[in-house]
Amino acid sequence: MAAKDILFDSDARAKLKVGVDKLANAVKVTLGPAGRNVLIDKKFGAPTSTKDGVTVAKEIELEDAFENMGAQMVREVASKTSDVAGDGTTTATVLAQAIYREGLKNVAAGARPIDLKRGIDRAVKEVVAELRSISRNISGKKEIAQVGTISANNDPEIGELIAEAMDKVGKDGVITVEEAKGMDTELKVVEGMQFDRGYLSPYFVTNPETMEAELEEALILIYDKKISNMKELLPILEKSAQSGRPLLIIAEDIEGEALATIVVNKLRGTLKVAAVKAPGFGDRRKAMLEDIAILTGGTVISEEKGYKLENATMAYLGQASRVNIDKDNTTIVEGKGKQEEITARINEIKGQIEKSTSDYDTEKLQERLAKLSGGVAVLNIGASTEVEMKEKKARVEDALHATRAAVQEGIVAGGGVALIRAIKGLERATADNDDQKTGIDIIRRALEEPLRQIVANTGTTDGAVVLEKVRSGEGDYGFNARTEEYENLVDAGVVDPTKVTRSALENAASVASILLTTEAAITDLPEDKADMPAMPPGGMGGMGGMY
């Protein structure tokens, strides 16, 4: 086991503070509409330019191990806030630095760290309650666009696109962000249920121009095994042919004689039919087939449930207004399933999402949820250079996350004003002793810091003057750093999701409290190069040298 280096008391806290300050000072220059960019060197490829706090924080590793521990603790604040709310990472970093700085002063003056922590915790609880009380719900497209615009660093194009996407697929719908092939940024909406399986044979194509199979008022056969024997498929094929409606066959696979017979009958005009493989694999495939069955009002023909393909009747078939199939995807539009069954399935998947502990499983469940809810929106992000594309894509992902947060918990005035107004909640915070009261006052002072930093980044106005003027106002009145005017910020579109502001404060206070109550810090001693064993002279041992 490697030898350790240990620092105690004020020595440990001072070193941690240096690390906290180095990281926070690099991150906080990005705060607000007047925030600056940070250029990050990449060992491979061009440097990355970003105005995203968590991206800056994740790049910082300090040489001194004790300083690095302080930096990593604050990096955790930014990361956790980003994971929970998608935005507010810079605000969280600024708050953590302010709470730790003010707390350290008091610890040095003799305050008990554990009482400071208790005071901080009580203060945060009351501030969060106050934030919730001043929060307002959003639903309109205009309000959603405002949140998206602010979170995308004041890019109205991105805000409008996100609002449009949410309008099309609903607030529970899946919105994915992808890199476009060209320079234009556009929104593409896939209506209905789409899965990534194309036709099994190009002979199923009904529209040679688009190379798509289009089935109107289609019947849908859903089978969870391979079909290789025509005999078991024949009864249901004859019944669907008599109805005169086109048939889509979804099965694990169709091969050999069965596929050849279907294709020949399609070419002769005897059958209107198309066949695709079932989506997904394993248990996920079973679940997706069940989703398709519920959406279309059909039944999954599965021997596990006691159903046999040769005994299938028309009652087992699902129905849809339209099915479009190309070589890669199948889209089922307007399935004829019962709405109450679809709603029950949606609620079941939502329950699974809440219980899921895996990010991958959660993502797949959300995709299934969106397909049942009515569609997937894809934001294709275009830019003139790769560096700009990556930066813009990251901003869109952040803005999308923050917009979802706003829909969940509502919005408050932006620009640091909501935190100033939430100071009122501290009147309800109780303290058992003077040190706890000091902890409450630390939060009172820290809540002003984001506004001070936003103003400082404009480089033209005195933070103390702005703070005093905002304090004297009421409600949503505050300083708009983009126009450098005092106005109603919500009316001006300067808003923050309540969840973002709340998460930033809670995470900052949590990590700053841990740092304040730290009495010792332990790290590995750096290996001294001088103590390393000398390399043996030329050649390899036992081989008398290599030539």
UniProtKB/Swiss-Prot annotation:
Reaction equation(s) it catalyzes: ATP + H2O + a folded polypeptide = ADP + phosphate + an unfolded polypeptide
GO terms for MF: ATP binding; ATP-dependent protein folding chaperone; isomerase activity; unfolded protein binding
Main location: cytoplasm
One cellular-component annotation, GO: cytoplasm
Listed GO biological process terms: protein refolding
UniProt keyword list: ATP-binding, Chaperone, Cytoplasm, Isomerase, Nucleotide-binding
Localization, UniProt: Cytoplasm
Presence of the UniProt keyword Chaperone in the record: yes
CDD domains for the chain: GroEL
Highest taxon listed in the record's lineage: Bacteria
Record EC number: 5.6.1.7
Known function: Together with its co-chaperonin GroES, plays an essential role in assisting protein folding. The GroEL-GroES system forms a nano-cage that allows encapsulation of the non-native substrate proteins and provides a physical environment optimized to promote and accelerate protein folding.
Subunit organization: Forms a cylinder of 14 subunits composed of two heptameric rings stacked back-to-back. Interacts with the co-chaperonin GroES.
Family membership: Belongs to the chaperonin (HSP60) family.
The protein's name: Chaperonin GroEL
Source organism of this protein record: Chlorobaculum parvum (strain DSM 263 / NCIMB 8327) (Chlorobium vibrioforme subsp. thiosulfatophilum)
Lineage: Bacteria, Pseudomonadati, Chlorobiota, Chlorobiia, Chlorobiales
